[in-house]
Amino acid sequence: ITTSHRNRKTLENIFFQKMAKNNNIVIVFDFDKTIIDVDSDNWVVDELGFTDSFNQLLPTMPWNSLMDRMMKELHDHGKTIEEIKQVLRRIPIHPRVIPAIKSAHALGCELRIVSDANTFFIETIIEHLGISDFFSEINTNPGFVDEQGRLTISPYHDFTKSSHGCSRCPPNMCKGLIIERIQASFAKEGKKMKMIYLGDGAGDYCPSLKLKAQDYMLPRKNFPVWDLISQNPMLVKASVRDWTDGEAMERILMGIINEEEDQEKEKMLSSENCKLSVGIVHEPLLPLAIQVPLAKSC
């Protein structure tokens, strides 16, 4: 084994030790129809038998306000918080989504959720699935149980006081603004992060327009955000890679992470090899010793 080969293997070991702890990738997941396979709001309403009431009220108010109203309806009809939790715990999810999340976290990626669902639904589901500790941040509408045991859902952005100013997004949440805040926080900390965004709905289109050229947008194929991006793909600066189900999500996500790690590894090895070559000092050859004949003794 040559010295240069040993140096390279040493550098690779150092690299992988660092990458196992942390890398420069942040993965932002939508929740409904991305992490889980259905819309959590519709799932709860349908499973508890309030679909007709929901459909009657739908044209009369914003979705977020409607869900708060539906939680009141459930409470008024004697539905308990435990019944809501039981419904949420049996929500369908593709079997490869959880392994994808665990693998991404193990590889050092930072994971976040940006969703128009609510904290109660999301936290109940991810705690049941055993993945709550993998997410560093959840951006969603606040949901809490009041003293009467009724689930109350509030808007992420209180549109009754002011507008968030984005015409593309629902009044209670602009996911694009959330992405800009995340980007700004990394810039302030001096972190050069690459973002991978996964989503399915129309509300995921605005954040796709905020991504940079080094980022990745993963829209679910044949879902609203994919349709919107397909209308004018040039508007999205990020690399777009669509997916169809949890298996495809895992494969594409792991592929991107591996690609990014390979690029970072090559950069690091190239940089370190350069330092090694510059740091080597060649000592000048010493002149050969001159043999002096010993004097004869008298």
Predicted regions and their residues:
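Alpha-helical substrate-recognition element adjacent to the catalytic core
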Residues: 20-147
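Mixed-charge, polar/low-complexity N-terminal
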Residues: 15-17, 60, 72-74, 164, ...
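A generic signature of intrinsically disordered, low-complexity regions enriched in glycine/proline
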Residues: 4, 9-11, 17, 34-36, ...
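Intrinsic-disorder-associated interaction segments
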Residues: 4, 8, 60-63, 77, ...
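C-terminal cap/substrate-recognition subdomain and adjoining C-terminal extension
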Residues: 96-102, 106-110, 117-298
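Non-catalytic pre-domain segments flanking phosphatase-related domains
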Residues: 1-31, 42, 50-51, 55, ...
